[in-house]
Amino acid sequence: MLKRAFELKGYHVVEAEDGQQALDMARRYHPNLIVVDLNMPVLDGLETIKHFRKLEGEGDHTPIVTITAYDVYGMEEAAKENGTNAYLTKPLDLDELDRALKGLGFIV
């Protein structure tokens, strides 16, 4: 559903199966936006965000949208401390996704 929503907006989407693959793909493709699920195998979403931000170093940062079905107390703060720019919960509301993307400067 999420991939299709982005494709309908004209975005090219590349999917990763796990956090490590997401990092490898980010190095290779240099995306304009990263969408991370907190519940991923190999490296979870928080670890993936943390490693990605370390790879980026100083300067401009690729926007990261974090999505989760496990919205437990403190999780949003932890995601933001690790470098996420927008935090959304499942079930995903596509209007909420649009607002988050607009807030990050994307045309939706």
Q: Can you say where each PLM-predicted feature lies in the sequence?
A:
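Charged docking surfaces used in two-component/phosphorelay signaling
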Residues: 3-8
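Acidic catalytic/metal-coordinating carboxylates
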Residues: 17-21, 44-51
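Active-site beta3 strand of CheY-like receiver
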Residues: 29-35
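Receiver (REC) domain active-site loop signature in two-component systems and cognate sites
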Residues: 40
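Alpha4 helix (beta4-alpha4-beta5 surface) of REC/receiver domains from two-component response regulators
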Residues: 47, 71-88, 99
